[in-house]
Amino acid sequence: MHGLLLAGLLALPMNVLAHPAEQQTSSVLSRRGVDIDSFRLPLKAKYMDSDATAQKIQALSFSKEDDYVSTATKLVKSTFPKSTFRVVDDHYIGTNGIGHVHFKQTAHGLDIDNSDFNVNIDRDGKVFSFGNSFFTGEIPKESPMVKREFSDPVKALKGAVKALNLPVKSENAKAKTVEGKESFEFQGTSGALSAPKAKLVYLQKEDGSLALTWKVETDVGDNWLLSYVDAHDSETVHNVVDYVASAEFKVFAWGLNDPTEGNPTSFRDPWTASSPFTWHSDGTNKYPTTRGNNAIAQDNPTGGSTYLNNYRPQSANLIFNYPWTAAMTPPSSYKDFSITQLFYTTNRYHDLLYSFGFNEAAGNFQVNNNNKGGKGNDFAIVNAQDGSGTNNANFATPPDGSPGRMRMYNWTTARPNRDGCLEAGIVIHEYTHGLSNRLCGGPANSACLNALESGGMGEGWGDFYATAIRLKPRDTKNTNYSMGAWAANDPKGIRAYLYSTNLQTNPYMYTSVNNLREVHGIGTVWATMLYELMWGLIEAHGGTYSADPVFRNGVPQDGRHLAMKIVMDGMALQPCNPNFVQARDAIIDADRALTNGANKCTIWKAFAKRGLGYGAKYDPRTRTGSNQLPPGC
């Protein structure tokens, strides 16, 4: 094995939001002036936690089947005996022993695209918990295939392009039939990174009715959209899902957040057993550059959509050691260092998440899954110094089997300008979008964090992991952290408040979400709660600040890594498009599955401190807060 020398430096950029009011800006389709928040999917999910599930199963005299998929299927049939559905081909058993099975409701052979059912099966083959957003209203009596009075897919494409002001030329579009019922790919278009697609599906609307729609898929770079266009009125777009998650947010060595925390250090062979082919091979080919099984890193100064022929540093002996100083400018003068840093951070995070259970079967990002389940050919495409934007970053997460795509931008908030690849937090934040989107709802469904509140939690998970990874041995529960301070050139960072366990420093409570209308603001509330959770577990189990966790029977032995593990496991347990209450319950269930509930009261205390206690209730307009603990705590 050749030695790999990585001179690593990291940092983390985001939008400059210094005050709470500034976080109320809407999410806008990049540079096209369309408010995407107005098209978000409604929250429809319900979640039955492990305690309630045990009571329900006992009341039903429900018995397990021969395998976990059959048991899960039996539960769905017993819960919705009159509904039709299909098993999604992405079930797997997590490293915590919980089996995850996902179902999609159908009507007349068409998917009801936002009607999902997830069932979690424990080690003994019994139902552990489940969630669903199945449609309970009246299904149309007649199949739309009988009279075929719906519009053709080309009109739907043109309707989406017009309504969302997309840079796609569709005047000469023609629909070509592809595999799948009423599924098409468009030819004769331009402006999208890949051929647009359309599929006829039903959609649950906000008012509880069912609409027949064309699900139109368009990847235009900054946005990768699923637009639900009414199949009878092509000028009406009901909802939009965006696979791209944007940030407003950095490695030296792993754990250093940005250039203020240390100096570049060289590492030899830094990969772990989570990357059996090393970082420079996919098991078939060896690459003398920043390419391997988990990621491919390159510069992208033009902001274009191609990447295979873009520039990457080359080293036959795998020594990637390049100069960088804070005075170097412009960022292109140190692109070798930047690409190397981005490659290092992405791979290092892949290996850490793999140890927690984000592996092949769970839908991680790898070319070669080595016969371990899931779909391969989907490493992370990570672009350094991407010219398609500034002062931001984003990550696109299509379903398992298609590569994720990260775009890291330069920051004009300082002189000389700063490179987002040098702040580890932004890379971690962005990659975490890939983690949460693959786990929530299953690897085959990347549309399960697209409601406003669930999308906010997607941002919050990114902030939480970025912050947890940068903790230092000297830190205590009184330590505060900002987000994006280096990139934004502002010590306060880009969030409304610092992450802190002090209620005066950070006063966010569950009911604060009532006044927030933007995902990053909502995400700050969620990440604040997870920060409380982490410090509660550190106080209970100690804080080991080694780069990698030490496991005993699958359980991390320190509070910091334990928090990261159960938060991640909770993502796989919760329903598609969850709310705060359901995500909290899923984390409590994750601890129950992992430790038999040893940390139940510690977790409850953390959430209760921030108003998400035992009596908290979700309502999209008026959430009810609670500092109450459950009986026994």
Curated annotation (Swiss-Prot):
GO terms for molecular function: metalloendopeptidase activity; zinc ion binding. Residues 19-246 form a propeptide. InterPro entries: FTP_domain, Fungal_virulence_M36, Peptidase_M36, Peptidase_M4/M1_CTD_sf. Its cofactor is Zn(2+). One of its GO terms (biological process) is proteolysis. Binds 1 zinc ion per subunit. Zn(2+) binds at H429, H433. PROSITE patterns: ZINC_PROTEASE (PS00142). It is found in: Secreted. The active site is at E430. GO terms for cellular component: extracellular region. It comes from the Eukaryota. Residues 1-18 form the signal peptide. Its main location: secreted. Glycans are attached at N410, N480. Secreted metalloproteinase probably acting as a virulence factor. Belongs to the peptidase M36 family. This is Extracellular metalloproteinase 3. It comes from Arthroderma otae (strain ATCC MYA-4605 / CBS 113480) (Microsporum canis).
